[in-house]
Amino acid sequence: MKPKKNQYQQMQAFDNMQGYQPQFGANPYPQQGQGSQMQTMGMQPMMPMQQGQQGQQGQQGFGFPGQQQGGGFQIPSGPTPSGPGQSVPGMLPVEESYIENILRLNRGKTATIYMTFENSKEWGSKIFRGVIEAAGRDHIIISDPKSGTRYLLLTIYLDYITFDEEIAYTYPYSMASYSPR
């Protein structure tokens, strides 16, 4: 039975590969100006004349993934940059005119909701009529004013919605930005 190589012996096998220079640690792809950062983390960049000296250093010069050798990266804390998720009262957030947001703007209005239930022998397609109470990313809640029944409808089955009155929809066109081509 052949004895298993330890990590140091495996790394020596890599050193013998012509032109191969392993770089392990937090960032295996150092960018410009990170050479000094590698040395502060207990790593030394390999140069052709240092390859022979590597055997004397043992595992000290290598940092394996999952092992931290002092130093390290810190994730900056503080406020996150504002983006398209910012909302203005009475308006939809920039580039977020999703169906649930439009339905929220029209809460309290009567709507007719057309849905198709594929692979259903009972229903196929069905029409729901009621007052919009709430809407989420994947659902719509309406109530039938005549019967008092509330329906929780999944938007995956939604085809389209009609309203008997004007739809409240204010899209912030002036805030939309397009990158030049």
Swiss-Prot record:
Residues 58-73 have a biased composition (Gly residues). InterPro entries: Spore_coat_GerQ (IPR014099). There is a cross-link at K2, K4, K5 (Isoglutamyl lysine isopeptide (Lys-Gln) (interchain with Q-?)). It is found in: Spore coat. Residues 30-57 have a biased composition (Low complexity). Changing K2 to A/Q: Cross-linking not affected. Cross-linking not affected. Cross-linking eliminated, but still localizes CwlJ properly. GO terms for cellular component: spore wall. Residues 19-89 are annotated as: Disordered. Keywords: Germination, Isopeptide bond, Sporulation. Its main location: other. Changing K5 to A/Q: Cross-linking not affected. Cross-linking not affected. Cross-linking eliminated, but still localizes CwlJ properly. GO terms for biological process: sporulation resulting in formation of a cellular spore. Induction: Expression is sigma E-dependent. Three N-terminal lysines form epsilon-(gamma-glutamyl)lysine isopeptide bonds with glutamines of other spore coat proteins. Essential for the localization of CwlJ in the spore coat and for spore germination triggered by calcium and dipicolinic acid (DPA). Its assembly into the spore coat is dependent on the coat morphogenetic proteins CotE and SpoIVA. Multimer. Is cross-linked by Tgl and YabG into an insoluble high-molecular-mass complex that appears very late in sporulation. NCBIfam families: spore_gerQ. This is Spore coat protein GerQ. It comes from Bacillus subtilis (strain 168). The gene is gerQ.
